[in-house]
């Protein structure tokens, strides 16, 4: 029976070895699979970070486009308002010329002239409300940014380098010169 027991023991040992070997193989396979899972989790996190970065860049890009578009729209509005205001200036000049001429030919009291006076006054009031400033007042210091020098004259009533008279009014809008005032300035 010794031999039988030996063989049984050998079979048990062999069986146990096989089971151990299978366990080790299974543990190795599980370890490999766990490592693959960890690698996939890491890749997933990296991809999520990339996706988040891409989303943030897209949002930033959209904000930049929005901001640039708003700036362009504002610039266009400003340019068109400027262009419109510059086109109004000759109308003001014409109305003022008519009023000056009416005084010369003595028709200042005619109803049509009164209508022109009211029209000019209304137009200037509207422009004032919009922020347009009239430049070129008498006795103000000459400023080359808003005044165009027509000539210099001697004057006892006006201080040197001050405006004696205004040939044409100047206009500014939001610190933008629409037209410089044409002025005569007192000499030093």
From Swiss-Prot:
Instruction: List where in the cell it is found.
Output: Cytoplasm
Alphabetical list of SUPFAM superfamilies matching this protein: Coiled-coil domain of nucleotide exchange factor GrpE, Head domain of nucleotide exchange factor GrpE
Q: Which GO terms describe its molecular function?
A: adenyl-nucleotide exchange factor activity; protein homodimerization activity; protein-folding chaperone binding; unfolded protein binding
Pfam families per record: GrpE (PF01025)
Which InterPro entries does the record associate with it? GrpE, GrpE_coiled_coil, GrpE_head
Supply the CDD domains for this chain: GrpE (cd00446)
Q: Which GO terms describe its cellular component?
A: cytosol
- GO process annotations (BP): protein folding
Which controlled-vocabulary keywords does the entry list?
Chaperone, Cytoplasm, Stress response
Domain of life from the UniProt record: Bacteria
Q: Indicate the family of this protein.
A: Belongs to the GrpE family.
Q: What does this protein do?
A: Participates actively in the response to hyperosmotic and heat shock by preventing the aggregation of stress-denatured proteins, in association with DnaK and GrpE. It is the nucleotide exchange factor for DnaK and may function as a thermosensor. Unfolded proteins bind initially to DnaJ; upon interaction with the DnaJ-bound protein, DnaK hydrolyzes its bound ATP, resulting in the formation of a stable complex. GrpE releases ADP from DnaK; ATP binding to DnaK triggers the release of the substrate protein, thus completing the reaction cycle.
Whom does it interact with, and what assembly results?
Homodimer.
Write down what this protein is called: Protein GrpE 2
> Which organism encodes this protein?
Buchnera aphidicola subsp. Acyrthosiphon pisum (strain APS) (Acyrthosiphon pisum symbiotic bacterium)
| Gene encoding the protein | grpE2
């Amino acid at each position: 029976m010794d031999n039988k027991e030996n063989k049984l023991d050998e079979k048990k040992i062999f069986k146990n070895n096989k089971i151990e070997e299978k366990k080790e193989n299974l543990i190795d396979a599980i370890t490999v699979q766990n490592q693959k899972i960890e690698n996939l989790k890491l890749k997933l996190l990296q991809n999520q970070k990339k996706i988040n970065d891409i989303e943030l860049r897209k949002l930033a890009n959209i904000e930049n486009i929005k901001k640039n578009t708003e700036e362009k729209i504002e610039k266009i509005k400003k340019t068109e308002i400027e262009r419109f205001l510059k086109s109004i200036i000759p109308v003001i000049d014409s109305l003022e010329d008519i009023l000056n001429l009416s005084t010369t030919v003595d028709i200042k009291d005619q109803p049509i002239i009164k209508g022109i006076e009211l029209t000019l006054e209304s137009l200037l009031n509207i422009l004032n409300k919009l922020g347009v400033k009239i430049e070129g007042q008498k006795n103000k210091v000459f400023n080359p940014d808003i005044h165009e020098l027509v000539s210099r004259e001697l004057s006892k009533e006006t201080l040197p380098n001050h405006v004696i008279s205004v040939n044409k009014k100047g206009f500014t809008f939001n610190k933008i010169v629409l037209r410089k005032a044409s002025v005569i300035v007192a000499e030093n």
